[in-house]
């Protein structure tokens, strides 16, 4: 059987396959990169929450007072800006004086190149490019009889 035309059917199939792959690789790579970036940010948020819990427990042991106000990235020994993401951590104070903080707040601000990731997170508050994650502060005092209610400190 004589071949007619410039391209054989097999060569046409290969060209079609290569062109489809070249069209799909770029979006798939971009999607994979976004998933990887979101995973790194989630890991960083969980690490900051864990470090904040440990810092609070250590601060209570050192100061013997449940009321703690000082929490920041510098106190935790973490870098605030990493790969286009700015992190901030603080305590969420309840309105009652001389009581422990009610939660840990981790704020994540994404720069312009990372704004496409905002919908990939389940943040408690989303304001523009800033995501806020709340985590309850888990700390139990073994013996509440030794707590001075007037000062919020352990006797």
Regions found by a protein language model. Give the residues of each.
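N-terminal alpha-helical signal peptides/signal-anchor transmembrane segments
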Residues: 28-32, 41-63
């Amino acid at each position: 059987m004589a071949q007619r035309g410039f391209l054989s059917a097999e060569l046409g199939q290969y060209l079609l396959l290569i062109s489809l792959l070249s069209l799909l690789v770029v979006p798939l790579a971009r999607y994979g990169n976004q998933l990887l970036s979101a995973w790194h940010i989630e890991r960083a948020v969980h690490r900051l929450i864990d470090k904040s819990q440990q810092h609070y427990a250590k601060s209570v042991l050192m100061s013997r007072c449940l009321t703690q106000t000082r929490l920041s990235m510098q106190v935790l020994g973490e870098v605030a800006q990493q790969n286009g993401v700015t992190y901030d951590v603080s305590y969420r104070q309840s309105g009652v004086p001389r009581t422990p903080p009610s939660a840990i707040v981790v704020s994540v601000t994404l720069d312009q190149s990372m704004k496409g990731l905002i919908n990939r997170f389940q943040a408690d508050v989303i304001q523009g490019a800033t995501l806020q994650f709340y985590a309850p502060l888990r700390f139990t005092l073994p013996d509440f009889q030794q707590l001075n209610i007037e000062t919020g400190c352990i006797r």
